[in-house]
Amino acid sequence: MKKFRLFALSLFLPFAFAGCSDDENEKEYQVELDAVVKNVHTNLQTSLGTDVPSLSVYIVSPRGTYFSTAKGANGAAVTPYSYFRFASNTKNFTSTAILKMMQDGWLKLDDKITDNIPGTTVPYTPDVADWNFPHKNEITIRQILQHNAGIYDLTNDASQYNIGGETYADYMLTTNPDFQFSASDYVKLLKDHNLTYGTPNTVYHYSNTGYTILSEIIARVYSQKVNSNKTYGDFMYDKIVGPSSVKPLAITFPELASDKQLPSPYIKGFIKYDTHDEITDLKNASAHIGEGNGVGTMAMLSQYIRTLMKGENVLYASSAELMRTNKGPATTNGYGLGCSNFQGIGYGHNGATEGYLSLMAYDPASDVSVVVLLPFWDLRGNNLNKCIATLNSTAIEAKRTLGY
């Protein structure tokens, strides 16, 4: 029962807020958007044959800022300021952190992860036996960002290594919900079981574990630069989203197994199984550090992705462009440096974890950003794919409603 998976989703798949006046055109946009979201939500419920708690979209455009939500019979009210676990959208934040360090001369994207941190005698990753996983000496920071490093994914993939048919992360979270995960914990398994997808730049394979390794690199680089022990979460707070960052946001990246409580107000996730249902909110996010442990709101994700892609946040416009376009040689889709290209929607990321599905994207051509939240997984048959596809279709329909 793979209820703890967190992954990137397929790339192919009544009121207005500040910035909108009360003229008739804007009122019509809101009415039309409400009707569109309600229709998509109703169609999803019909297709799944079950109640869907809610479906929400937050869109910022030259024509105004709009929010619309449709609630099922058993759903809770959602606002742009409701907190939720935004899962693999975290990878875009991790990429931003790496590129920020690149801008500041703290690291080089094409350094091997066994190289020393610039200006120090300390390597990017621990030089100990348990970290000698396959191809470690060949892997660069850029390749991990691009999912071209060949690093086996211990949280999504049970094909090469599993415990009773479950991924390592699933098994540990099921048997010991309070287990404190770490990058060292994961890489030891890679080493002990010789787990790999192949040599770098020969295969594209999405890897949560790769991004957890990046979180360790961020922590080690930051610790060296400030001469104090720091974590991934410390850098994210100090430099990317905290009060002293360019665009402060109340986004958090829980690292402790015990840090399970979401801020208020928050939306609970919901998972539907063949035999039972599960409400998800109090969860151990330490299994997903750097790749899926982010917590925030739709409004926060919108401000983040919009300012980031416009070069108005911590990254220069040139760095944001690099994030969008720098694909690996083995990549066959639109994935750059922790950034997806969603056709008809824009650049950003998406995510799925424990009853939550979400998407954030910005389209430079139209200056439109969109965030979609569906706090629901249906694990019966092939129904989860229908839920995932709804993220993209909602974003596309929302843009179309505003004329984009």
Regions found by a protein language model. Give the residues of each.
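Bacterial Sec-dependent N-terminal signal peptides
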Residues: 1-29
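Short active-site loop at a secondary-structure junction
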Residues: 53, 75-143, 196-209, 289-292, ...
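Short, surface-exposed loop or secondary-structure junction motifs
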Residues: 126-346, 350-352
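Catalytic loop of the DD-peptidase/beta-lactamase superfamily, centered on the K-T-G motif
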Residues: 20-76, 202, 221-224, 230, ...
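Residues that line or immediately flank small-molecule/substrate-binding pockets and catalytic motifs
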Residues: 8, 59, 120, 148, ...
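Short, solvent-exposed turn/loop segments enriched in Gly/Ser/Thr/Pro and often Arg
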Residues: 59-61, 65, 113, 255-258
